[in-house]
Amino acid sequence: MKIHNAIIFATLKHQSQKRKGTDIPYIVHPMEVMQILTENDCSENAIVAGILHDTLEDTDTRPEEIEKEFGKEILELVQSESEDKSKSWKERKQHTIDCLKNDTLETKLVCCADKLSNIRSMYADFQNCGADLWKRFNAPKDELAWYYRSITDALADLNSFKMYAELKHTVKILFDTIN
């Protein structure tokens, strides 16, 4: 029931949003994160947090709402995936990388699924629009490459998970193989 409630909650919170530079409803991303976590046999809490992972950062959701509806553990997982938008892009990304090194397994799994969904989307969009893809982001391609490579390195202890292997492979293709 928690997963069902999280889907409804996230769908309502993200209802007017689109994926960056596309007409794709934003909710597709949390649903893909849910699918990735499910395929990798993750816990219900990780799956619920994966569905909700962008609600604090990208909507008007308050932490108390998540804690009341889903509990403190899920709130903490969601908070671990949320960035402080008052900081610069580089500061936010460096903070994420630094924290990941000491984070819990569940936090790392949610992060890995989120980044895999993002990198899949970037790769598919690159196939459609080429180098114009990089114009959508708040950082140039070389900084995105640094970030995704650093995230992949920080998640290296997930190397027994299928999603990690796909993340590592897709990051390599997108940033090392394609010009």
Task: Please place each PLM-identified region on the residue numbering.
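Active-site helical microenvironments for divalent-metal-assisted chemistry
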Residues: 1-179
